[in-house]
């Protein structure tokens, strides 16, 4: 079994604790968070794990270190783990400072330890199936992608404990959600370049973005359009459409997968009873492969860096035209 340490025990860390305990290949041996209540909450899912006295002790206990802390300390913990010979599985983003993240990626590569980033759709059925359909020609010529994300409030209710998500310094929907769909788009269409972007912020300048719009393109000129907004009475909407000349594919809410040949989108399967469990198990299955040196589908740290560069460009309103 893979002895695993979890650092950062908010909602994402707690979910990972729950699902790693369920998985036969992992043993959660140590937990750490600066908030004692978060440690207690995670320990309810992994009662056999030790709540470490500090991050250093937690890192020393495991062979794999999972990091779900806010972005700012992520580099420090990742390098401490990797230089100690531990495999590292990170939540995204790698950070918020691009040069610091470039340095992190270079130094992680130099250690030679297994590393991956938890873009949650990487090992999922939708990305796997759409990739196969595109390669088989079932979609015709790929024609780009549309990303639409809207929320009545940000952060979402289930993220209330992660207060940093509401601030521009580390949070916001672009880093937290749109990044997943940019990763997905690059996996299918190839590397993207930011053409133009606009991000709007509330009058209280330390809060995160409320609206974003952007256009990105592949080297061949295929467009990826992004629209995100917060506000108004509406349900959450998280949607990626990969467009083809014969058929298009749409992924909604991270797990609903549908196909259109020009008519209404038709679901490929009923909604699963527990989509999060299916997604996390797929990620963990591939993490086992990666640690064993086998081929895997998880996001690499290089892919995560590319996404971070795009995200920070969108948030800054950068692009070819600026």
Q: What residue spans do the PLM features occupy?
A:
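N-terminal Rossmann-like dinucleotide-binding module
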Residues: 1-45
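Beta-loop-alpha module in the N-terminal Rossmann-like domain of NAD(P)-dependent dehydrogenases
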Residues: 16, 46-105
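Active-site loop of classical SDR/Rossmann-like NAD(P)-dependent oxidoreductases
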Residues: 34, 271-285, 299
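C-terminal helix-rich "cap/oligomerization" subdomain common to oxidoreductases
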Residues: 57, 64-66, 219, 286-322
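Hydrophobic residues in well-ordered beta-strands that form the structural core
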Residues: 67, 90, 115-117, 226, ...
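Rossmann-fold dehydrogenase core element
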Residues: 103-121, 141-145
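Predominantly a Rossmann-like dinucleotide-binding segment in NAD(P)-dependent oxidoreductases
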Residues: 121-198, 202-204
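Contiguous beta-strand/loop segments that form the cofactor/metal-binding neighborhood of enzyme cores
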Residues: 182-256, 284-293
């Amino acid at each position: 079994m893979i002895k695993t340490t979890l650092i950062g025990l908010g909602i994402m860390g707690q979910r990972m604790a729950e699902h790693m305990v369920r998985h036969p290949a992992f043993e959660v041996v140590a937990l750490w968070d600066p908030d004692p209540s978060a440690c207690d909450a995670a320990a309810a899912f992994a009662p056999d794990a030790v709540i470490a006295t500090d991050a250093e002790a937690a890192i020393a206990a495991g062979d794999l270190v999972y990091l779900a802390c806010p972005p700012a300390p992520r580099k420090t913990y990742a390098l401490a783990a990797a230089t100690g010979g531990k495999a590292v599985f990170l939540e995204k983003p790698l950070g918020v400072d691009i040069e610091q993240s470039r340095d992190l990626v270079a130094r992680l590569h130099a250690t030679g330890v297994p590393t991956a980033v938890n873009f949650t759709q990487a090992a999922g059925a939708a990305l796997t199936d759409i990739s196969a359909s595109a390669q088989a020609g079932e979609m015709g010529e790929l024609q780009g992608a549309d990303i639409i994300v809207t929320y009545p409030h940000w952060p979402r209710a289930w993220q209330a404990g992660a207060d940093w998500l509401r601030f521009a310094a580390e949070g916001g929907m672009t880093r937290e959600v749109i990044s997943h769909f940019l990763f997905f788009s690059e996996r299918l269409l190839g590397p993207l370049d930011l053409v133009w972007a606009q991000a709007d912020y509330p009058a209280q300048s330390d809060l995160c973005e409320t609206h974003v719009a952007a256009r990105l393109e592949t080297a061949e000129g295929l467009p990826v359009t992004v629209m995100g907004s917060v506000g108004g009475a509406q349900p959450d909407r998280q949607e990626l459409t990969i467009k083809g000349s014969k058929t298009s594919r749409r992924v909604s809410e991270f797990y609903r997968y549908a196909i259109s040949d020009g008519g209404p989108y038709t679901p490929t399967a009923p909604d699963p009873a527990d989509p999060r469990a299916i997604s996390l198990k797929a990620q963990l299955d591939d993490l086992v492969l990666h640690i064993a040196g086998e081929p895997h589908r998880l996001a690499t740290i290089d892919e995560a860096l590319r996404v971070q560069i795009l995200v920070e460009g969108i948030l800054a309103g950068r692009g070819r035209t600026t």
